Amino acid sequence: MLFSYLLATLPLLANAALTYKGADISSVFIEEKAGVAYKNLAGETQALEAILTDNGVNSIRQRVWVKNGDYDLTYNVNLAKRVAATGASIYLDLHYSDDWADPKHQTTPDGWSTDDINTLADQIYQYTLSVCNTFAEEKINVEIVSIGNEITSGLLWPLGKTPNYENIARLLHSGAWGVKDSKLATKPKILIHLDNGWDWDQQKYFYDTALGTGLLTSDDFDMIGVSYYPFYNEKATLASLKTSLTNIQTTYGKEVAVVETNWPVKCSSPEFAFPADLKDIPFSVDGQVTFLQRLADTLTATKASGFFYWEPAWTKNAGLGSSCEDNLLVDYNTNQVRSSVKAFGQV
């Protein structure tokens, strides 16, 4: 009888190893403003964050832009208040830009220096400090703060663009201390985020080089985050991701998580071949579940912290920037959540 009980609880014990089963829902206010009313699995209208947390999501990622408007500080404070009411933790993704920040775009915010690293280092410190202090004043706990978004090619260009790793390291150090010096009662985990999480060589080169300057220290940050999108490179196998995540933890002693990922329900003409160990997964709702289960298994095996599904409900942008037509966990025709959302509670 005891043996049978232990067998039955083994999956539950494995699932408990993932600290974060999250989603980035940064565009929810824009969607709601456009008239989108999300529906839960029962077909009832419900707030998106509640639908997700009811199905196992326990952390919400929010991108923060500097300029006033969509994704600005006020936008994110208001979103965080809604998220906090569900009990989910909050992860702030500071882009340090007025627009998208990624490996191809890292534009310095308007009014920030583009020709003096001393001034820019102070500006990133003061801005980060101000963001964190605003959340402290609003009595909103923050679990994670990412100092930059997909900064493989640096941040705050041109001063912080590769190959100027001394400037990159200095800017990251300043951003990190903006978090550390804040009034937040419980200090958030400080995270550095690169793309191509499956590419260990890329990860290693960035961290070895940045840390090698001596201007960024291991004590400056707590977590390493990676993006993992299987549809951008056939080399992005789960096996490669497993190797990379294992090596990151062994080499740098940091908590690691996949902070952006998703899987399509429709991908008629993918721009790139899919990885070999994922080709058997269909482009469907069931395929989304299978992908998330395999990803979760990989993360559990490597003792990674968890994953965040990027923009699962952005119905006005179903392809989410990829060559696939639809990567959402919500049907953009009906605004009803798909059954694949239940995967968060099953992994």
Swiss-Prot record:
One of its GO terms (cellular component) is extracellular region. Keywords: Carbohydrate metabolism, Cell wall biogenesis/degradation, Glycosidase, Hydrolase, Polysaccharide degradation, Secreted, Signal. Residues 1-16 form the signal peptide. One of its GO terms (molecular function) is glucosidase activity. The active site is at 150 (proton donor), 260 (nucleophile). It is found in: Secreted. Its EC number is 3.2.1.89. Coiled coil: none annotated. It comes from the Eukaryota. GO terms for biological process: cell wall organization; pectin catabolic process. It catalyses: The enzyme specifically hydrolyzes (1->4)-beta-D-galactosidic linkages in type I arabinogalactans. Belongs to the glycosyl hydrolase 53 family. Endogalactanase involved in the degradation of plant cell wall polysaccharides, and more particularly of hairy regions of pectin. This is Probable arabinogalactan endo-beta-1,4-galactanase A. It comes from Aspergillus flavus (strain ATCC 200026 / FGSC A1120 / IAM 13836 / NRRL 3357 / JCM 12722 / SRRC 167). The lineage of its organism: Eukaryota, Fungi, Dikarya, Ascomycota, Pezizomycotina. The gene is galA.
